[in-house]
């Protein structure tokens, strides 16, 4: 239950969106010695635990008995997560700025591909964190844990539970650190500021990884590079999937305004596309209006001004207006508070005094700046 400028928010948690206050956690978990744990926070007794948590070079001295007490401290977080499994294998990496990354996954005998896939998670995290921090703001904690869980993917402070080592899910859940764990937006009222912004950010991280890691791995393999480039030419680009999902929703009759409480949508379909896809398109279209470079500056300023402060949609727009110098209330009101759509058509085309002229007509009810590209007979644009 959270109290803010609107009063108390006693919204029940129904395994969907949540809204909570930051606090400091101290947690002690006593469990059979055979279990390996991972989760939120910093382990306070690593040299009594071992399992890869010990200080490099230190001798592990576990207490007598068949149980261990794991002692965690987690400052300035709004939830605490932990997982335990006797079959976890623990990979540890340290980034250039001193953040410790933990990967805990279920070891499978005689399955080296499983080991390689989870090792790739650790290596990819080290690779992309500098890009993430430069683009979205510094990671403020000392550790992050990628933990093999039982279902899907779910984000928590300092860690995530993952059903598998797919990097798309890994990046998405990690980016929830920037778009929820650090912002603390009321997800019940603004799920699109959580899931939509995370979708948009993780697509950028995936593109960075693809261009800077995947492609480099293929150097010297001309056939593989050609195959990757040919696939890239026909596969969706960045936000294309989200645009298609939004278009389908807009035509379906199930769309509701994004101001709808996340638990009160008439359909899960309407909620899902609004929160994820239309939220992602919101961020991409903002870049179309103000320019991608300015949009990126907006995100860094948003992080600077509003981390650990529970921003709402108006707070975001005010930052965008400050950075861009453009009035943007209209954009928020049309896109978020209505289901009006953007659609323009060519109304007429004529020649006047040797000059070709084109008149556009707005068909949809939502206004939007429009760029037009003309292609001439010789192929020039």
Labelled PLM ranges:
Residues 19-21, 64-66, 277, 352, ...:
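Solvent-exposed loop and beta-edge segments used for protein-protein assembly and interaction
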Residues 37, 363-368:
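A short beta-turn/strand-edge loop motif at beta-sheet boundaries
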Residues 40-44, 86, 189-195, 297-301, ...:
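Composition- and surface-driven signal marking solvent-exposed, interaction-prone regions
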Residues 72, 103-363:
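Hydrophobic alpha-helical and helix-loop surface patches within well-folded domains
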